């Protein structure tokens, strides 16, 4: 704080010093001039002292102002230092989070690569399924379609064939002994009647024999057909 005493001027009580106030006929002329010069010097010294005091006071005032400004600067520097420290903490935290995020991103990239590889496999499997579905659509036997359907391959069933719930073809019947002879595949009159008198004639017996032979041959033809279809053996 500035010293206010420095701002108070030095007051010289004896402001006038000349030969009129000195004793006469005592001092030599040179001494009188010396004394008068001393008075002038004292005034000059007082003026310089006052100027120096004023300068010192002004300097102290300026120093006080600078001290206030420096204190403000110190406060601002302290605040800035605190803010910088907070920013450094936040920056360190952010750097840590960035490291974590980079790790998470790397993990997610690996997951995406795995998913993409899995998608390629799924696409391949889907292509296979679509191809199979296309094949099934173009070549299948429906349970509900009423139009005629056909198979290019043999059909094997476990027990029997049925039509409207009624069995029409069953399992093969075994134990049949194959007949011999010539089967009758041509036409014959199933309503053929035979005339037989009270006494058998040769022609009547021959006609009956022929009819019996035709019947046996037709039976053989039917047996052969059943064998060829695998119904008997």
Swiss-Prot record:
Chain intervals for the UniProt region annotation (Inverted coiled coil): 175-233
Keyword Aminoacyl-tRNA synthetase on entry: no
Cellular compartment(s): Virion
Chief localization: virion
Keyword rRNA-binding applies: no
Function field: Cell-perforating component and plug protein of the phage tail machine. Together with gp4 and gp10, gp26 is required for stabilization of the condensed DNA within the capsid by plugging the hole through which the DNA enters. Host cell membrane perforation allows viral DNA ejection. The needle penetrates the host outer membrane. The needle is released and the internal head protein gp7 is ejected to form an extra-cellular channel.
Official protein name in the record: Tail needle protein gp26
Species lineage: Viruses, Duplodnaviria, Heunggongvirae, Uroviricota, Caudoviricetes
């Amino acid at each position: 704080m500035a010293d206010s005493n420095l701002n108070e001027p030095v007051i010289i009580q004896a402001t006038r010093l000349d030969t009129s106030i000195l004793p006469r006929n005592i001092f030599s002329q040179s001494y009188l001039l010396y004394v008068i010069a001393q008075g002038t010097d004292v005034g000059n010294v007082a003026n310089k002292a006052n100027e120096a005091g004023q300068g010192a006071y002004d300097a102290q005032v300026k120093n006080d102002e600078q001290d206030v400004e420096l204190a403000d600067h110190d406060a601002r520097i302290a605040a800035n230092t605190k803010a910088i420290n907070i920013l450094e903490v936040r920056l360190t935290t952010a750097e840590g989070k960035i490291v974590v995020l980079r790790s998470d991103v790397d993990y997610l990239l690996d997951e995406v690569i795995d998913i993409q590889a899995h998608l390629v496999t799924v696409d391949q499997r889907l292509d296979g399924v679509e191809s199979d579905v296309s094949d099934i659509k173009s070549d299948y036997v429906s349970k509900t379609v009423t139009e005629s359907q056909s198979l290019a391959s043999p059909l094997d069933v476990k027990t029997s064939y049925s039509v409207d719930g009624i069995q029409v073809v069953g399992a093969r019947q075994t134990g049949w002994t194959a007949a011999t002879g010539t089967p009758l595949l041509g036409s014959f009159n199933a309503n053929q009647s035979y005339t037989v008198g009270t006494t058998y004639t040769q022609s009547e017996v021959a006609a009956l024999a022929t009819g019996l032979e035709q019947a046996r041959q037709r039976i053989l033809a039917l047996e052969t057909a059943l064998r060829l279809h695998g119904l008997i053996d």
